[in-house]
Amino acid sequence: YLDAMTIGPDKVNQLRHVKFLKDMPTVFDHMQRHREILAPKFACVHSHLEQGLQGMGRWTQPEGGYFVSFDARPGLARTIVRMAAEAGVKLTPAGAAFPYGNDPEDANLRLAPSYPPFEEVDRAMRVFVTCVQLATVRQALEQA
């Protein structure tokens, strides 16, 4: 199977999926296990956003998927990513949800809590909230 290159989807990987996810009850069971892992992480993100960033941005509360979309005030996304990196938190690049990563407002960030362990999500969100707060206050002071 693996010695020939093909154009198109990976047929061997598709076969693995078909054998693993045999029927719809198996798919639903597997997705429920994903929910049990992901739901607390997304709840953590939402809690930090609600408690720390009211009036400083907008965000989605997805019922599926792997990202929370956060819109800071215009002109702050790259600054927030830089500040978080300086504090040791790696965020998805600013504007990643836009074609070629070009967000004309420099406002959008995608938060991706699905991969790290819960404790890291919690710590990273504390840093993220602090960076958004600091960047927002600095911008307001510069514009005053």
Where are the regions that the model predicts?
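PLP-dependent class I/II
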Residues: Y1-A144
